[in-house]
Amino acid sequence: MQYTFLSHMEAAVRNRNNLLHYVKKSGPISRTDIWKRMDISRASVTQLVQQLQSQNLIIETGRSKSGSGRKQRYIEFNGASHKMFAFDWTSRMFYLTNLSGEVLYEKALSFDRLPQPGEFADALVAEAGHVTEMGLYAPEELQGIVLALPGLINCETASLLYSAKLHWQNVDIAQLFCNRIPGKVFIERTGNIMMLGVYNSGESWKESHFQLFIMDADGIGVSAIVRGHCQHGMNFMYGELGHIKLHSSVPCSCGQHGCLEAVISDLFERSGGRITPEILDHLANAVSTTINISDVGEAILVGSYIDMLTREQSDALVERIRGQVTCLQQRNLKIQCAHNSRQLACAGLSAYAFDRLFPVG
């Protein structure tokens, strides 16, 4: 077995990023609390804080009296200093956002038909140019663009491997924006982006195993965070829940028959756009099976099908899922339906950009 070691510079960058992540999650916080909780020397904390301050990534927020009587300076993450263009395909929303998740500009983009990759890039570049002309950010603040797209995504190379919804295959997304939008190009599958939106708000980050299920007319899938990391799979095909097979001859856009998302779409259309008990049964079976396999601590259900549920249907779906989970009484399991997909995607785009700009693993 060969071992690789971090260079001094790589170790310094990782320490800096670890401290920045900690301040983002825990701030406002004192330097003393940082070195106590992170097991980093005082000298290292002082040096790293000075470095992050020089990059305008953290700022001081005032003083607070410590238990020993000394007044300490508190610091917090300065997400407003770094900005990103962002786009979510599901909502067709284009944003200018900062790394704190604040939306500085938003606009719904319309496409008369499914765009070709070049047409898609042209539309986003044009909107980015419009925002730039508005003077909403200083040139040095812009870090690039981050996209949430449906399909199989290689986030490391910023390429889309295959999307049945977009009818794209092997598209180099990074190349589409090269020299057209300053900074980096990040892309991730829609489910992972929404999941990060949930995970970085509220208390969900405390769960070591967390899943988000998209139940949408555009597709069905599951995304997971395990110990703080998005799961992608060996071939970037993690979470293709919509393509598990049922005993049905209904054709799917993937070219096969009987896929869960195709069957549910067919049932939905034949019911006149209503969520029927049969649809709820299929959704409950899929979610409970996934939970039985993965043993998550929290599951969130989102998407257009979930948005259409009445309160009674929502409660019934959750109960059906819980009723099919093995050894429920021995699990610390939380299941809930969320009705804010657009907001989750926007928050997730910002969170994802931060994680990619300042990686810790």
Predicted features and spans:
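Short, acidic, Ser/Thr-enriched surface-loop or helix-capping motifs
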Residues: 98, 155, 225
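ATP-binding/phosphotransfer module of carbohydrate and carboxylate kinases, centering on a glycine-rich
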Residues: 1-61, 68-70, 74-108, 115-137, ...
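Glycine-rich phosphate-binding loop and adjoining helix at the ATP-binding site
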Residues: 106-209, 312-324
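Short glycine-rich anion-binding loops that position phosphate/pyrophosphate groups of nucleotides
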Residues: 150-152, 217-219, 305-306
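Glycine/GP-enriched mid-protein hinge/lid loop-to-helix segment characteristic of carbohydrate kinases
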Residues: 106, 169, 182-276
